[in-house]
Amino acid sequence: TTPLSSKLLFYIYILNGWQQIHDNNSGKALGTQLEYRPDNLNLINWNTYIGDESSSSAPDNRMRYFTDLYWVHNPDGVFSITSCVYAGNQKRKQGNELTNNYWWQANFIGRYSFNESLSLSGRVEYFSDANNVQISAINPNISGFSAFSGGLCLNVKIKKQALLRFDGRYFGAKDNLFIDKNNLPSKSALWLVSNMTVWF
């Protein structure tokens, strides 16, 4: 960690690989983080990742390049905003050539706090992965995955150690990426999810 100024911090990481604890190959990966706090209400963060993703389960994978940029505004206030964009490129060996396989995402989240225990958040998002690097469609006849989503989430804080969430989320796409309640291909899906998080 290196402080570049009173508002700017730089981090560098040596990693085993992409979101993994066990190293799948002999090479290491490199990550960087630049954190900028212009004032007490805003945080702007930029991350990068470069690493060799070849392994026994994905022998054609080569270098992966990834970057994301996110902004957090007024996280402890009555109304807060979080927004993020990211993009990646997975190099793959096909014959004697290396191909570029891109994916990207953008989202915007707003949260309104009624009091210390109750808040409502809304989210809109778009995700595109034309070459199935991160995700594949449930429908085996569809190649690539591109979809948008929007949702509302009610957050109920239970004392200081637990958070209960009720989340409704709609997904839509131009292709039949999803499966409906009749087990048929569909261009949309609706999720209703609840969960509880406990910390100590």
Language model feature labels by segment:
Residues 19-21, 52-55:
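Short, small-residue-enriched loops and turns at beta-alpha junctions
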Residues 1-43, 47:
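Aromatic- and glycine-enriched pocket-lining scaffold segments that form the walls
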Residues 44-48, 52, 58-200:
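Outer-membrane beta-barrel pore domains
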